[in-house]
């Protein structure tokens, strides 16, 4: 199922705040599942599971080394969320 009518986004949670004309126009994003592409919603970069409930929290690629911040919860194995803090 795609995001905001975009069929190429894999399994993502959809848009919570409406869509302004395409995959990259979501105002808010629901939680992503593994396989969601970065063009679904502007909050995400790369693919990871359980990320992106708001545009402020960004999905980063695969390891905590790409975050550039230390983590409070046993970082890091396969997923990484980053902006001001990293949470695995």
From Swiss-Prot:
One of its GO terms (cellular component) is intermediate filament. Coiled coil: none annotated. Keywords: Keratin, Repeat. The keyword Repeat applies. The keyword Flavoprotein does not apply. Residues 4-72 are annotated as: 10 X 2 AA repeats of CG. It comes from the Eukaryota. In the hair cortex, hair keratin intermediate filaments are embedded in an interfilamentous matrix, consisting of hair keratin-associated proteins (KRTAP), which are essential for the formation of a rigid and resistant hair shaft through their extensive disulfide bond cross-linking with abundant cysteine residues of hair keratins. The matrix proteins include the high-sulfur and high-glycine-tyrosine keratins. Human have a similar number of genes as other primates despite the relative hairlessness of humans. Belongs to the KRTAP type 28 family. This is Small cysteine and glycine repeat-containing protein 1. It comes from Homo sapiens. The lineage of its organism: Eukaryota, Metazoa, Chordata, Craniata, Vertebrata.
